[in-house]
Amino acid sequence: MFHGTTILCVRRDGKVAIASDGQVSLEKTVMKNTAKKVRRLGEGQVLAGFAGSTADAFTLFERFEAKLKEHQKNMARACVELGKDWRTDRFLRRLEALLIVADKEKTFILSGAGDVIEPDYGIAAVGSGGPYAFAAARALMAHTQMSARDVVHQSLTIAGEIDIYTNANISIEEL
């Protein structure tokens, strides 16, 4: 089973940034250090990141992008519809991945159970290093004036120093 990762999304001052580490592990072995787990969807208007099985995440990215097109780039509606499909489709129910998606206005976490969660604090984090990145981001948001981009970078750096499944090869996308 592929293990761990860290995806973090932060909103601040009208900007949204999403970041991931680059490590892919298989049991106790690092298989890749430079994986790109965040990307732009919906003609560049939606940011997305995944934790979990890579093949499953690509399947979900494709399904999510199809929902975005179907619902005229209404990200919230696309999330709800993908969540419904995830709960009812036998194939999708077997997928092991979590997604964070964000546009200029909203952020959602899509869980493997088909849940669609809009997180508090303007911060969303998933993966094995998610709790560490989330805590670091909350502290940085409360006690600094750092930009969203700088918060995700510094928070992932901290998570990578704590979580063995998170490395310091950070990819960031921003709107």
From Swiss-Prot:
The active site is at T5. Its EC number is 3.4.25.2. It catalyses: ATP-dependent cleavage of peptide bonds with broad specificity. Keywords: Allosteric enzyme, Cytoplasm, Hydrolase, Metal-binding, Protease, Sodium, Stress response, Threonine protease. Belongs to the peptidase T1B family. HslV subfamily. A double ring-shaped homohexamer of HslV is capped on each side by a ring-shaped HslU homohexamer. The assembly of the HslU/HslV complex is dependent on binding of ATP. This is ATP-dependent protease subunit HslV. It comes from Myxococcus xanthus (strain DK1622). The gene is hslV.
